[in-house]
Design a protein with these regions (language model features):
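Short alpha-helix capping/helix-loop boundary micro-motifs
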Residues: 2, 26-30
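Short, surface-exposed secondary-structure edge patches
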Residues: 6, 31-35
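C-terminal structural segments of small proteins and small subunits
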Residues: 12-13, 48-78
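Short, structured beta-strand/loop micro-motifs enriched in basic residues and often containing a Trp
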Residues: 14-27
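Residue-level recognition of beta-strand microenvironments
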Residues: 20, 34, 45-47
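Conserved beta-strand/loop element in small beta-rich adapter and peptidoglycan-binding domains
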Residues: 38-44
Length: 78
């Protein structure tokens, strides 16, 4: 189980958030408010046909996220 970023996860993957980059601060704050925090479990539900955006599930919340935003989230695929 190699560490990677959320942008590299595939549909169906279940991931554990290990770290979120310090910058950009605004994005980090928004992710924290949505429940994307270290230790959270994320499931990749869908990826758009051109690869961007991706739909993820964090707890009971469904989110749509751009790949550029997903690159600041370090994960471990379970």
């Amino acid at each position: 189980m190699n560490p990677t970023t959320l942008a590299n996860a595939q549909v169906g993957d279940v991931c554990l958030v290990t770290e979120i980059a310090q910058k950009p601060v605004e994005l980090r704050s928004r992710l924290y408010a949505l429940g994307v925090i270290p230790g959270a479990s994320i499931q990749i539900l869908r990826v758009a046909p051109l690869g961007d955006p991706m739909q993820i599930k964090v707890g009971a919340t469904l989110l749509s996220m751009r790949k550029t935003d997903a690159r600041i989230i370090n994960i471990q695929i379970l």
